[in-house]
Amino acid sequence: MSDQLQTTDLSRVHMVGIGGAGMSGIARILLDRGYQVSGSDMKESRSIMALRAAGAQIQVGHAEDNLRLSGEMPTVVVTSFAAIPQDNPELVGAREAGIPVLRRSDILALLLQDRRAFLLAGTHGKTSTTSMAVAALQAAGQDPSFAIGGQLNRAGTNAHNGTGEVFVAEADESDGSFLSYSPEIAVVTNIEPDHLDYFKTESAYREVFEKFAHRIVPGGFLVVCLDDPGSAALAEELIAGAEEGNPLPFTVVGYGTAEGCDAHPSVPPAAIIESTEVTAEGTVSALRLTEEVKKAAEEAAGTYSLRVAIPGIHMVLNAAAAVLGSVLLGADVDKVIAGIGGFDGVRRRFEYHGTRQDVEVYDDYAHHPTEVAAVLAAARQRVEARGGRIVAVFQPHLYSRTMNFADEFAEALSLADQVVLLDIFGAREEPVEGVDSRIIGNKIDASTDWVFEPDFSKVSSVVAGLVQPGDMVLTIGAGTVTMLADEILLELDRGDRG
């Protein structure tokens, strides 16, 4: 950790973009620890209202005067560099006043300092796996602190300042900022090219995960998914380097299905999913914890029945990672397994919104081709029993990602029966001439019907006109598409009333 971070004064923290999922969680923990918090954002939100109720001073809109919301100038300003432009008047004013401007990850690194850090990294699955780990540790009688990119359904929050010694958090690789952390347990769920607007090359993206692994504290664990080629390759390279005379101060272990573990024999498997069965209550798996866990948990080795309520093998893999990491931290394995069984999900991760006219409506945050494919495969498991179809309402996120992965998005969306494509949600990016969602649609398999509806206000009525009893509608994407799930239900209500 840099000398600047070591000496950072957190007594008065001003957060630019305080309403975001990651920023609001850090604000909540800072408030719980007794620091003064102020901030600003472009629009009102439930997160902002909750933070105000907890004592934060927050202004909607950005202006230099916001720096004085708490009555005096802040000791530090925090922002998300990816989301907030550097000419923001509050950032400019802070620099002119000599106030340190830090990233969210820098502040999280400070909050992690006196805790045992259990960090979840990977291209996909961070939020779900982090949330499962929290549920597991809470069920084991611990009170972990946590900072998550989504809101836990049961807890109704995305962050908590716990009394226990463990801090569970997502480690976001999108701008390399997770290199600020020093975890005891680091899980890597998968590594696939993403965020190429920042990293430029696939090799640079993969290399940042190797650097992250070397941030693990001596005696800690790197836990990798062996069903994913990218994370398995990371483990294999580290182990090979150790065998060639570059010893590692941490232990590398894997988790995955029996097939995944068998495919990478050089990586010692610590958690093996030996069988799975889809039931009305969810997916039930036989999870074997091997002798590898005895390095940290002498009594935990054995085979357990693991129930995961949320559909999809990707969720079973996430659950296995959460179990393994929790057990390596010393949590009681039986209580951990029970905690996973009671986990009921995270907002915007295969989140059920309702049923109208025998049409189920779900919402999911998936915005990378692999995530889209995983959620549609999970939906297929559920919809087959109903005899209906999958109607995917997809809003691509970022022009750069749409251009880089148009083929892969088309392949993933071809798993649906009907696709409704919205205009691209550009977020921080400017529109690119000639690039819209049709570059995906034109490559979707001929067996899947698709329509392009650029008028956001018309999408819910378009969807209502396409669905049939027994169908499942999934609104998918990281942008404003989430607003449509309830709108579609209302549109179906209107149709039901005639």
Curated annotation (Swiss-Prot):
GO terms, molecular function: ATP binding; UDP-N-acetylmuramate-L-alanine ligase activity
GO CC entries: cytoplasm
EC number: 6.3.2.8
List of residues binding ATP: 122-128
SUPFAM superfamilies (alphabetical): MurCD N-terminal domain, MurD-like peptide ligases, catalytic domain, MurD-like peptide ligases, peptide-binding domain
Keywords: ATP-binding, Cell cycle, Cell division, Cell shape, Cell wall biogenesis/degradation, Cytoplasm, Ligase, Nucleotide-binding, Peptidoglycan synthesis
Location within or outside the cell: Cytoplasm
Catalysed reactions, semicolon-separated: UDP-N-acetyl-alpha-D-muramate + L-alanine + ATP = UDP-N-acetyl-alpha-D-muramoyl-L-alanine + ADP + phosphate + H(+)
Record-level GO BP terms: cell division; cell wall organization; peptidoglycan biosynthetic process; regulation of cell shape
Annotated metabolic or biological route of this protein: Cell wall biogenesis; peptidoglycan biosynthesis
Principal localisation: cytoplasm
Enzyme class: ligase
The keyword Cell membrane belongs to this UniProt entry's keyword annotation: no
Annotated NCBIfam families: murC (TIGR01082)
Family: Belongs to the MurCDEF family.
Its biological purpose: Cell wall formation.
Listed name of the protein: UDP-N-acetylmuramate--L-alanine ligase
Originating species: Corynebacterium jeikeium (strain K411)
Organism lineage string: Bacteria, Bacillati, Actinomycetota, Actinomycetes, Mycobacteriales
